[in-house]
């Protein structure tokens, strides 16, 4: 079956001797996902029309009609009244057809000096620029929530882990600040990516530019671009800016996923460091006692989704010769879904972090296990003249003794410690036990980047200042 609308003629139909089949029409149409670009498409078209009038390529009356018609179309779209037509293929031709129906020949003059190739590239950049700014704001909200929680827990002691084994005591505030650093780098990547997004392709036309006396810099200024794409072939054909954004988004989600993994572990009754607010959890259809951390679990899963979009976009571009190819129609759905996934995740996590209930005693009890102050004992011996490797070996022997006895280093008396460490007994004094307390351990890491409560509060203050 073929389309009867072809009798009216598509924007390009005069070249062909038979109409497009309905199957091909459905296969090649993008309007039901690229209509998301409608408002930026109108914005770009208005800037283009203003330039055409300023350059006397179209008449002032045509510009006025275009502006009037676009205002009506924008209202129809915002009210949900616009009738999108599959037969008109994409967002651009749908809007142009409606404009022409409203204002006549002036609508047909709008496309002078441009192609859908540079038009869609402009639309995507305009849209993505706004979404980058939105995501930047959401990253700020998440970091603010983490900083609030870190400040409240600057002195809350928990075990630090390597290989998921207890390593050394840290503060919960210090642990959260690690994620503040990760998300801060993510924000920097978004800002840097925005610089390359914010270049105007319009004026490149199909691929070679246009013979009309256009003013690309004027359009760039009107639309808030930092400049123009310098090469017309590159302007219409590459989507590296979208790939770069998706790569930055994949890193955002990777950091979210790492945090999610810890939230799931911490909430487990076997660990019990935190509890998440009920509104971020679900129950079980069969087990009435269950409270499942579905939000962080789902965030881990959605990370794979964004990673997949990155691979999809890289694969999309890898085999394309210059200039524009229809392949690029497939750039939008991965890009749109990446934005939606990242934005929704960041918004939810900012709210979820603010609602975390911390269980300090459970954290402290866990930090007392696993000989977390063993390194402090080694440092104690080093400060009394013993080479570090010798101190390391001596403390390792003491740990083995305590493990056999089922006690901690701090549980040994001074006499027992000297007895078990005869080679260094002369270096061990009564003050050794102050080094084996959790508070003493974290307080001793009192340098920039360290876990001492004083440093945690200083880091929170610095991070807040950086957000302003």
From Swiss-Prot:
It is found in: Cytoplasm. Its main location: cytoplasm. GO terms for molecular function: argininosuccinate lyase activity. The keyword Thylakoid does not apply. Pfam families: ASL_C2 (PF14698), Lyase_1 (PF00206). GO terms for biological process: arginine biosynthetic process via ornithine; L-arginine biosynthetic process. InterPro entries: Arg_succ_lyase_C, Argininosuccinate_lyase, Fumarase/histidase_N, Fumarate_lyase_CS, Fumarate_lyase_fam, Fumarate_lyase_N, L-Aspartase-like. The keyword Transmembrane helix does not apply. Belongs to the lyase 1 family. Argininosuccinate lyase subfamily. This is Argininosuccinate lyase. The lineage of its organism: Bacteria, Pseudomonadati, Pseudomonadota, Betaproteobacteria, Burkholderiales. The gene is argH.
